[in-house]
């Protein structure tokens, strides 16, 4: 990785201002006695590909025209994706077809086992949250299809809805000052503020551990908010993992959390079992 993000998100950006982007699952109101708080990314962490990329398969011939691809600008991916979604609608791709495409997204290896493990645990053990640069329609559609939505107490992502013309409309989650993250979301802000909010709601009682599972460079940002005793689960050999390794070589001891790389959700299950045995 040539472009280091070691200094990203060291000062608090603007607070999230998109309350509509936070979706409560069908699970009960938050319990204040869970011992562990676990965050999940969505693309290439829960699902084994980028959900936005899967939309290409819905286009005529399974490809996007060159003129459309040429409109992409670095740091403005969501704006580009909005043009893609408008194009799909113009080509007759319906909301039902988009949802069906999302439902076909395969889970990452071992993710069903990890989700079922967490669902089987008492509420006093794990509070589970999703933080993703995807959107509400994609994430909620997939979680509902797989039967995993009751596990997630909160979903923080870009708001989305189908308008009267059947076009999926996207909005940015929030604004921020992090120069390294996409303009629409800095996950470190979300994690930092959510943890602080929940600790206040718990009467000042912290979690025993905060856990973060992800894969991308934008998952490295929130992992920097973790403390000693917390655990980062980077997908092995993906950008998050490589950036953690890079930091370890350039600034030994700077990354505070324990690091457990994963290839399968089963790797995470094994670590969670050990944590439960020790606490």
Swiss-Prot record:
Binding sites annotated in the UniProt record for substrate: 52, 133
Binding-site list for Mg(2+): 41, 43, 215
Cofactor annotation: Mg(2+)
EC number(s) stated in the UniProt entry for this protein: 3.1.3.75
Broad class of the protein's primary localization: other
Biological processes annotated in GO: bone mineralization; regulation of bone mineralization
Alphabetized GO MF terms: metal ion binding; phosphatase activity; phosphocholine phosphatase activity; phosphoethanolamine phosphatase activity
PANTHER family documented for this protein: PHOSPHATASE, ORPHAN 1, 2, PHOSPHOETHANOLAMINE_PHOSPHOCHOLINE PHOSPHATASE
Protein name as catalogued: Probable phosphatase phospho1
Organism encoding this protein: Danio rerio (Zebrafish)
Gene that specifies this protein: phospho1
């Amino acid at each position: 990785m040539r472009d280091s993000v070691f200094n990203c998100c060291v000062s608090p950006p603007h607070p999230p201002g998109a309350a509509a982007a936070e979706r409560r699952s069908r699970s009960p109101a938050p319990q204040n006695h869970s011992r562990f708080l676990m965050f999940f990314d969505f693309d290439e962490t829960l699902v084994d590909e980028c959900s936005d990329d899967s939309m290409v398969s819905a286009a005529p011939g399974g490809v996007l025209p060159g003129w459309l691809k040429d409109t992409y600008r670095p740091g403005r991916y969501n704006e580009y994706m909005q043009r893609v979604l408008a194009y799909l609608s113009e080509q007759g791709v319906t909301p039902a077809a988009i949802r069906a495409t999302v439902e076909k997204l395969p889970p990452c290896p071992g993710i069903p086992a990890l989700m079922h493990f967490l669902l089987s645990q008492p509420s006093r053990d794990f509070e589970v949250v999703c933080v993703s640069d995807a959107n509400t329609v994609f994430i909620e559609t997939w979680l509902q299809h797989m039967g995993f939505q009751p596990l997630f107490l909160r979903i923080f992502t870009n708001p989305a809805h189908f308008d009267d013309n059947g076009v999926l409309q996207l909005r940015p989650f929030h604004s921020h000052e992090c120069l390294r993250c996409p303009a629409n979301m800095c996950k470190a802000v979300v994690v930092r503020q959510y943890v602080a909010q929940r600790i206040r709601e718990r009467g000042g009682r912290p979690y025993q551990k905060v856990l973060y599972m992800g894969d991308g460079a934008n998952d490295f940002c929130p992992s920097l908010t973790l403390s000693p005793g917390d655990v980062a689960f980077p997908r092995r050999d993906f950008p998050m993992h490589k950036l953690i390794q890079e930091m370890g070589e350039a600034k030994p001891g700077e990354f505070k959390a324990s690091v457990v790389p994963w290839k399968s959700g089963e790797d995470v299950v094994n670590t969670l079992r050990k944590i439960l045995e020790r606490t």
